[in-house]
Every structure is written in structure tokens, then in C-alpha cells.
Amino acid sequence: KAGVGFKAGVKDYRLTYYTPDYETKDTDILAAFRVTPQPGVPAEEAGAAVAAESSTGTWTTVWTDGLTSLDRYKGRCYHIEAVVGEENQFIAYVAYPLDLFEEGSVTNMFTSIVGNVFGFKALRALRLEDLRIPPSYSKTFQGPPHGIQVERDKLNKYGRPLLGCTIKPKLGLSAKNYGRAVYECLRGGLDFTKDDENVNSQPFMRWRDRFVFCAEAIYKAQAETGEIKGHYLNATAGTCEEMIKRAVFARELGAPIVMHDYLTGGFTANTSLAHYCRDNGLLLHIHRAMHAVIDRQKNHGMHFRVLAKALRMSGGDHIHAGTVVGKLEGEREMTLGFVDLLRDDFIEKDRSRGIFFTQDWVSMPGVIPVASGGIHVWHMPALTEIFGDDSVLQFGGGTLGHPWGNAPGAVANRVALEACVQARNEGRDLAREGNEIIREAAKWSPELAAACEVWK
């Protein structure tokens, strides 16, 4: 009797998982995969294989399939289109029923969608380009601990981008000298300074010493400037328990913000830290160390916009998002695409910016994008125009490399930023008149003039 209706053996995935007539539901999680099949494998079979292996399928028919409703739980490849200008490359759209995923777990979502299928031998390469997260799923996540508006209110800073600086050299300084550099940068006019992503708790500088000296620097700079200051204290550690212990100590010192390396630390650790930060009034800065391992290849891995969406769900108030400046125009559009996905409530589908699906975040708070890496005062007009007010512009070498020292480097950046914001508010075109605006400001700021000379 057990054998009735059950036929053992291997059958093509497309017979079950390729359903071009399927109408997607509002509750489905939708994925866009860039699929490069092996020679001789049809696109439909490759797309169906991805849907199967990332949902209910396995390599052969099993009789326990009859004990559940595959129609209810299977992923479906519902549309395939060829990639223009690429030979044997396709975008496969897959719909996943919501019941396949644990609520509030980015870890489980990724384990399902990208956990197993990337090593599949029918595929030469596979890249997850985008995900549509339905409100019915995103609502199961807390999201960013505080979000953009709450951060502005905490800092009492409005109407301009925030300024940051990564302390260099990133490894080798003692805690006392590290704290001194933090103080000089904040005293000069920056809003934030930052631990580098690989500063955790090494023999030359243990975390507790660093936290204490940085807190002292923050309070001293606040007292002298009358502005609220912060330093991203990197709480990333070898265990979740140790990470939370460091965050607790940061809170006890009265620090306003901590930091986490969310890809090396992992999504489970990140979500735990985000929950702690919301409950205890700490802002959370996120560094994306290791992202290029996942997102750099154009035909394999995962696009950063997917990692950015996952971070917004898992929780973070800031995340690094590249700089755009000096890159290709196309990359600018792609970067601004995922910057919008981080900040806005509702983002329309726009393939020219790499956005494959309309994304509705409903009321989930936004994340502030951080522009960092190789930027200096001459880039300030472009950065102000491209990223707008809700951003952090981070100048590491562009502050600490100033010929007169750290504090004058900070002054130069603050003067350049204030000049750009004022010019923008007066209706001037930053893209066209940027260099002229910086030159005018440099006439009455010797610190800015010196910086302009070094990086001209």
C-alpha cells in the first residue's frame, strides 16, 4: 500500500519547481538570482534547481513527500529572463512561501535561501542579486536599535551630514595615545571617531583600557566644544557573551555608541547586540568587514544590497556603504540604490539602479550610510550632494594626515562641510561649483588651506 502514488527515482526539477504561470503573493519572499548554468543545462532546469534546493527539494524523490503539501511549501521559479550582453546568463525569479522561514531570524532566512544551493553542480555560478522582504516578514524584526531621527535627537545635530574619522594607525597604539588622538579629532570639530574593524582586544591595547581612555576623550571634548560627541567602541569579540559584556561596560561609561563587525561576527550575534542597544539607549555602528568576499564577483555570491537589507532587519544605526566618489557613473547609481534601501520607507523597483523589486519597509527605522575610504576635503562637495544630510562622512587619513596634526585636520573637514552645506542651502550647484566653494572657505581657514594644498 505504501507504494501507491509514489514513483522512486530522479526527475527533472523543472517538472515540479518551474511554474511560469504562478502569481506571486504579497506574503512571499521574492529572490532574483543571476544564474550561469553548466553547458547543456537549460535555463528553466537551472532556475528550478535553485528554487528546489533552497526550499523543499532534494536530489531524488522521497516517499515522505506524500506526508506534507509540497504545493504549499515549495519555492517556485516563476520567471526567467536572459541577461543582456552576457552569454548563457539568466535572471531567475524565485518565490518562497513565508512559512519556510523562522520569524525574526536573518540567520535562518540566509541558511534557507543561500545556504546550500551555491555549490550545486548544475550551475557554473550563482549570485543573489536582490530580495523582496514582505512587510509580513519584516514586521517580525526589531530592525535598527534607534534609527535616523532618534539619533539626530540624541546628538542634537540637524541639517547636515555627520563627520567621522577612523583612528590610525589602526593597530599598535597604546590605549593612552589612542585616547589622545580621539580627543584631538573630536575637539577639532568632528562628531565621531571610530575604532578600526580589527581593533578588538589585542596585547598592545586591551578593550577595557581603550574604552576608558576614549570615554575620557569624549567627555573632555564635549565640555570644551558644547557639542555631543561619540566614539564607535568596537564591541566585536570571540563570543556573544564577551561582546555583550563589552557593550555593558560602554553603557556604564556613558558612551553613546558601540560598534560591531556584522559579517565576521555573524547575524545572530548582531541581532543580539542590536536588541541590547535598543533596550539600553546605545547607538550601533556597523562595519561590513568581509563583504567583498561575498559581493565582489559579478556573477557569483551575493550583491551588497542584499547584505544591506539583511542588516536593516538584523539591526544597526550606521553601516559602511562605499564612497562613490571617483568611481564609474554606473556604480554611483547602484550605490545610491542600496543607500535608498537603507534609509527610505518605500523604494520603487528600478532596474537601472539594480533594484529588482519594490520594497516596502512600512515603519522600520532607517540606517545611516557611512561614506569612508580614501576621501579628503576636495571630495566634500560631491559627498554632500550625493549622500545628503542623513549620512556620516568618514575621513581617516583625510583627518590624521593633515600636515599640522589631528585637530587641525578635523577643523579643515568641519569648515569644508559647513561651507558646502551653506552653499547648498543658498541654492548653489555643488557638482559644478564645488572646488570654488572649498577655495573660498580656505581663504579664512588656514587649516583648510593647508589640507587643500596637501591633497590637491
From Swiss-Prot:
GO biological process, one term: photorespiration
CDD domains linked to this entry: RuBisCO_large_I
Cofactor(s) this protein requires: Mg(2+)
InterPro entries, alphabetized: RuBisCO, RuBisCo_large_chain_AS, RuBisCO_lsu_C, RuBisCO_lsu_C_sf, RuBisCO_lsu_fd_N, RuBisCO_lsu_N_sf, RuBisCO_lsuI
Residues the record lists as binding Mg(2+): K194, D196, E197
Tagged with keyword NADP: no
Gene3D superfamilies registered for this protein in UniProt: Ribulose bisphosphate carboxylase, large subunit, C-terminal domain (3.20.20.110), RuBisCO large subunit, N-terminal domain (3.30.70.150)
Sites annotated Transition state stabilizer: K327
EC nos: 4.1.1.39
Pfam families the UniProt entry points to: RuBisCO_large, RuBisCO_large_N
Catalytic activity, reaction form: 2 (2R)-3-phosphoglycerate + 2 H(+) = D-ribulose 1,5-bisphosphate + CO2 + H2O; D-ribulose 1,5-bisphosphate + O2 = 2-phosphoglycolate + (2R)-3-phosphoglycerate + 2 H(+)
HAMAP family assigned: RuBisCO_L_type1
Subunit structure, as described in the record: Heterohexadecamer of 8 large chains and 8 small chains; disulfide-linked. The disulfide link is formed within the large subunit homodimers.
Other comment: The basic functional RuBisCO is composed of a large chain homodimer in a 'head-to-tail' conformation. In form I RuBisCO this homodimer is arranged in a barrel-like tetramer with the small subunits forming a tetrameric 'cap' on each end of the 'barrel'.
Protein task: RuBisCO catalyzes two reactions: the carboxylation of D-ribulose 1,5-bisphosphate, the primary event in carbon dioxide fixation, as well as the oxidative fragmentation of the pentose substrate in the photorespiration process. Both reactions occur simultaneously and in competition at the same active site.
Record protein name field: Ribulose bisphosphate carboxylase large chain
Organism expressing this protein natively: Barnardia japonica
Gene name of the encoded protein: rbcL
